[in-house]
Amino acid sequence: MRRNTDQESPIMSYYSSFFFLFLFSFLTSFRVSAQDPTYVYHTCQNTANYTSNSTYNNNLKTLLASLSSRNASYSTGFQNATVGQAPDRVTGLFNCRGDVSTEVCRRCVSFAVNDTLTRCPNQKEATLYYDECVLRYSNQNILSTLITTGGVILVNTRNVTSNQLDLLSDLVLPTLNQAATVALNSSKKFGTRKNNFTALQSFYGLVQCTPDLTRQDCSRCLQLVINQIPTDRIGARIINPSCTSRYEIYAFYTESAVPPPPPPPSISTPPVSAPPRSGKDGNSKVLVIAIVVPIIVAVLLFIAGYCFLTRRARKSYYTPSAFAGDDITTADSLQLDYRTIQTATDDFVESNKIGQGGFGEVYKGTLSDGTEVAVKRLSKSSGQGEVEFKNEVVLVAKLQHRNLVRLLGFCLDGEERVLVYEYVPNKSLDYFLFDPAKKGQLDWTRRYKIIGGVARGILYLHQDSRLTIIHRDLKASNILLDADMNPKIADFGMARIFGLDQTEENTSRIVGTYGYMSPEYAMHGQYSMKSDVYSFGVLVLEIISGKKNSSFYQTDGAHDLVSYAWGLWSNGRPLELVDPAIVENCQRNEVVRCVHIGLLCVQEDPAERPTLSTIVLMLTSNTVTLPVPRQPGLFFQSRIGKDPLDTDTTSKSLLGSVDDASITDIHPR
């Protein structure tokens, strides 16, 4: 019996070693592939462009090469750089998630550097977000500067049970505030927190600031992204240029407390033994194989299942629900042949490219009858493109108004999806409004006409058309200007139709532009006509001030344009909001009245915001008395003199105000 035992031992050792070697190799390859960067979101500020042979382009190439070089600070996860002199100076940085390895950080930054030239071609300002890193560059100074606008809210669209909702309401904000306390005491400005969700499941939270922020600015930024994050989802995140917050019920980051897996056992040469002399030795081989093979199969099935569930959980952020109920045949009369569009645009030649939107590129074209058109070619790589394409065709084909861009045709040809609009020669409002060299062309008379035209266009959508339509993405870049500077509302990809008696709708997919979203929509997915009113109010304040809400730099303690305007109004100084380019030649009574209307539109309570019919009346009749505006929405101010996340007590007092839909404890600065 002893001899048989000695002979089984090397066999067991060999098969066990083979098993662990195979498993280790598989896991290693799995981990490497999991480190590929996962794209999340990007923004391109298309108010300033550069040309291929310009000094700015050369400076940008030098900057990106520096950030992605082998000598970059991947081990710390953060690096910034500045290249050139004004006006061609370019400033940039990368910030990797605090838990990723040096190699993962390097790969993500290198990937982002190549990706930005595709996603934001010829744009002087861009921000690209990935799960593993963020890359930013700008022609303005972005270093050590707190920016709390220009981001996005993403929610996990998986279903939430009532029991889970109760647990989430108790866990989300405390967990994120605990993570914030860790981040504020970390050199990387990075913190995580893990709490129990159920007996068998954990809850994970993560927050992070760019390390170049001061502790106070990081605290302020985290306060905003924690208070604004939806608490009624199975997972959610807010990302903006300066900080981020996220929670899930799965481990979406590497838990530093988990020790690394032990190295695989070394494979030693088994001792030479005599060949087996009995059938029992053969049976032992069969027994070993019978044990080892099922274990390998079980492990592989477990890993495959884990990959599937993890990817499905991640994908739920970005996969929209099916677009049911649309009838694209109602627009059949507008369908164009793809070859006709190719001919009109010279086969989409680069010299005809006039813009780039969220779902594709825009080209100028000329039809065979001489009609100039704008051709919107949806990107094949856009996961949302087909939904927005169908939505835009069905909606815009039924709309006819002088302040709405007119759809002339569309094309569905294989993977090609193309929209053909009337050509508007003066591009978009933001092209003039936010450019120091061009904003002078928008005197007060033109700005006032634009405000009125946009109001009439939205009124048509809400009340006067055959359909009640909520635009959901009103902003300066979606207001086109014709040859006479008349405004035309564009981009209906996010729009939704309401029923006859419907006043609001809920959605689990928050879309639009952060900074223009109303509080109830950004935090709870509730949108209505009053959501568009809020966006219109932000737009009015932008038109008056010439300042962009999505990249507003801190002034007198204000973190965004709305709070800045509210502060001036509260102190009796509304004229200080006016763009210096027009302040000497404006009708002051009209300006003050428009500031008043803008602040009425951005009030926190949707019920107190005026309807579009009332707004148009306010703009056209000076005899209408305007009510006193109340506090705007999305305002966060610490009621305690010190940093709001310094202590557990302060954190808890901060959390209570965000649980209610009304956000009653939020105050203007």
From Swiss-Prot:
Provide Extracellular-side residue ranges. Answer: 35-285
Per the UniProt entry, the signal peptide is: 1-34
- Which residues does the entry place in the Cytoplasmic compartment? 307-669
Primary site of residence? membrane
Residues with the modification Phosphothreonine, per the entry, are T513
- Gene3D superfamilies from the UniProt entry: Gnk2 domain, C-X8-C-X2-C motif (3.30.430.20), Phosphorylase Kinase, domain 1 (3.30.200.20), Transferase(Phosphotransferase) domain 1 (1.10.510.10)
Entry-annotated residues carrying Phosphotyrosine? Y421, Y521
Write out the GO MF terms: ATP binding; protein serine kinase activity; protein serine/threonine kinase activity
EC number(s) given by UniProt: 2.7.11.-
Q: Which cysteines are joined by disulfide bonds?
A: C96-C105, C108-C133, C209-C218, C221-C243
**Localisation per UniProt entry:** Membrane
In the bilayer, the protein is annotated as: Single-pass membrane protein
Region of interest: Disordered: 260-280
What induces it, per record?
A: By salicylic acid (SA) or by a bacterial pathogen infection. May be regulated by WRKY DNA-binding proteins at the transcriptional level.
Composition skew (Pro residues), residue ranges? 260-274
Active site at D473 (proton acceptor)
Pfam families in the record, alphabetically?
Answer: CR_prot_dom_plant, PK_Tyr_Ser-Thr, Stress-antifung
Q: Which reaction does it catalyse?
A: L-seryl-[protein] + ATP = O-phospho-L-seryl-[protein] + ADP + H(+); L-threonyl-[protein] + ATP = O-phospho-L-threonyl-[protein] + ADP + H(+)
PANTHER family given in the database record: CYSTEINE-RICH RECEPTOR-LIKE PROTEIN KINASE 10-RELATED, RECEPTOR-LIKE SERINE/THREONINE-PROTEIN KINASE SD1-8
Protein name from the UniProt record: Cysteine-rich receptor-like protein kinase 10
What is the protein's species of origin?
A: Arabidopsis thaliana
Q: What is the lineage of its organism?
A: Eukaryota, Viridiplantae, Streptophyta, Embryophyta, Tracheophyta
